[in-house]
Structure formats: C-alpha cells, structure tokens
Amino acid sequence: MAAPASDSGGSQQSPSSSPGSREGAGVAAKGAPDCGDAGARDAAETVSGLPPLEDYECKICYNYFDADRRAPKLLACLHTFCQECLSQLQLRAAAAAAAAAAPERPPRPPPWLCPPGAIACPVCRHRTPLPDSRVHGLPNNTKLAEAFPLALRAAHDPLPQDRLPPLPARLPAPAAAPPPTPAPPPPPSPAPPQPPPPPPAEDAAPGPRARPGLRAPGAYDSCQNCKRAALTAGCVCVVFSFLSMVVLLFTGLIFVNHYGGGGTPGGGAPPGEAPATGSPSPSPVGPICLSVASILALFSVVVTWVICWLKYRPEGAAAGSTGGSGGGGGPRARAAAGGARRSDT
C-alpha cells in the first residue's frame, strides 16, 4: 500500500508543481511575440524555398553575385564566393609563392598558400583544385545563379554591376502636358481680347536684350574657326610675300648691275658720255623688280602686324567692343576689360 501512496503523492506533487510550469509557460508566451517576426520570416523563407538574402552576396567583398565578373563560384568545400575575389586570392597566392622561393631557406608557407593549380577556401582552408589553373574553370553555384532576384538586387545594391534600374520618373512627363489644357477658360470672356497681345510683346522684349549679352556656343565656335582661318591665311601670305621679295630683290640687283647702263658688266657708262654704239640698252626689269620687292616688304610688315594684333590682343578689348555695340552691357564690359588688364599685368 505504500507504493500506491507514493504514487498518489507523486500524482499530487505534479499538480502542485504545475504553477511553476505555468509561470514558465507564461514567460515563454511573453517571449513568443518578440520572436514572432523572425519566425514569420523563417516560415516565409521555408515556404518560398529560396535561400535568405545574405546568401546572395559574397562573404569577402559583400557584393551581390551577378552573371559577369561576380559570378558565384562553388568550391569543393561547398562554400561560394565571387569570381573576382577568388581571382585576387589566386594572384596573392602566386605572389607569395614567388617571394617564398627567392631565399635559400624558404620560411614556412602560410596556411592559405596552395600549389599553382589549387586555391584555399578563406573560411575552412580546404584546398580546391583549379581546372587549367584558372578560377574561371570552377563551377557556378546554379542554385544561387538561377534563383537570384534581379529586381531585388537592383533595389538593395547601391552600385549594381550589370545595369542601372529604369527611371520611372520620365513616364509622368506626358501627364504634365494636361496643364496647358486649362488655357481654354480665357476664350469664354470675349470682352478682353486685347490684353493677350501685350504679354507676347513683353516676352519678346527680353529676347533682343539678351541677344547682345549672350552668345551661343555655335557662334563662338564659328568665330574661333574664322579667326583661325584668317591667321593661317595671313601667315601664308607673309611667307609668300617674303620669299617673293627676296627673289625679286636679287633679280633686280642682278639686272641693275649687268644691264643698268652700257659698258662692261658690273660697270655703267661714265656720266656725261653717251653709251657706245654696240652696248646693250638699259633694261627696266631691274628697277621694276626692286619696286615690287619693296612693295612686298611693306605688305609683309603690315600683314605681320595685323596678325600679331589679332592673336595677342586682350580679351577685354573684344568684350568692350561687344558691350559697346550692345548698349546695355557698359559696366560689365568695363569690369571685364579691367579684369583683363589686371591679368595681363
């Protein structure tokens, strides 16, 4: 009979211990709402059958995988990293191997150093052989590559690798066109048809005022092209005139010395004496050549001065001339001219 009593006592103690268990259940019930969101997220993930968003990024550079230079490469240890990070690890391993082979007694290689045809996992140090000693030969993680949401990546990644997301802000632009439609309300008032003409006159007035002050980029380029063409033509004219002057000068001197007067070459007839009957008559070619040479020399000097003036004149002078022609830009032109003088000094 003692055993049943003990059993009954045990059965009586179990109800007595129920308040504690009830308190534990209450604490668990209080903690349950805190982790309700996490449970809902886990449930959503398990229902969807897709890995969490953290699995779509490389654990080395924390960039999302893509189909180009950050392709998800699967190692033999089933760890996944992007192709670019694995390539950097391979290059560093090759550099460390070259540095270790230089001394006579090479030090102990680091744990991540592998043969040229293998790469060590940054997490577990497991060595994975590289096909053809290239990271490109590693297989891709097809589960991540096929299930990766591109739209989600474009929304979360501040610097997407493939392309920028489309700009939907331009779509409402056509909707901005309806505001001009309220213009029809003015027609119902036929009495004031004259007020509308003055606004166009006021709008047209600022146009001519702004024309002298502003210059379109096309006009500036055409002006620069014309100036460059004028300088080139002037330089060609100066060179041609100088060469022609030299040739004509030598030709004129030769004709004057040899055919300037009768007698032997190089000496004319003495003054006051008539030329001999057999002597050649003086040729006018020499004086003509000398005259043309002098004219060409003067022309070369003038053109050279004009070219130097056009090329080296200060911009303030041009601004002052344009401002004076515009009429309303006097103070601005003076300020520009003063700034140009200060910059020249």
From Swiss-Prot:
PANTHER family: RING-TYPE DOMAIN-CONTAINING PROTEIN (PTHR22791:SF17)
Sequence ranges of Low complexity compositional bias: 1-21, 202-213, 332-345
PROSITE patterns, per database record: ZF_RING_1 (PS00518), ZF_RING_2 (PS50089)
Protein name: RING finger protein 228
Pfam families noted in UniProt: zf-RING_UBOX
Region (Disordered): 1-43, 159-213, 319-345
ZnF RING-type span: 58-125
Membrane-protein topology: Multi-pass membrane protein
InterPro entries: RING_finger_E3_ubiq-ligases (IPR051435), Znf-RING_euk (IPR027370), Znf_RING (IPR001841), Znf_RING/FYVE/PHD (IPR013083), Znf_RING_CS (IPR017907)
Source species of the chain: Homo sapiens (Human)
Biased composition (Pro residues): 163-201
Origin superkingdom: Eukaryota
Annotated TM spans: 236-256, 290-310
GO biological process, alphabetically ordered: protein ubiquitination
Gene3D superfamilies: Zinc/RING finger domain, C3HC4 (zinc finger)
Compositional bias annotation for Gly residues: 321-331
Cellular component aspect of the GO annotation: membrane
GO molecular function: ubiquitin protein ligase activity; zinc ion binding
Keywords from the UniProt entry: Membrane, Metal-binding, Transmembrane, Transmembrane helix, Zinc, Zinc-finger
Localization per Swiss-Prot or TrEMBL: Membrane
The keyword Ion transport appears for this protein: no
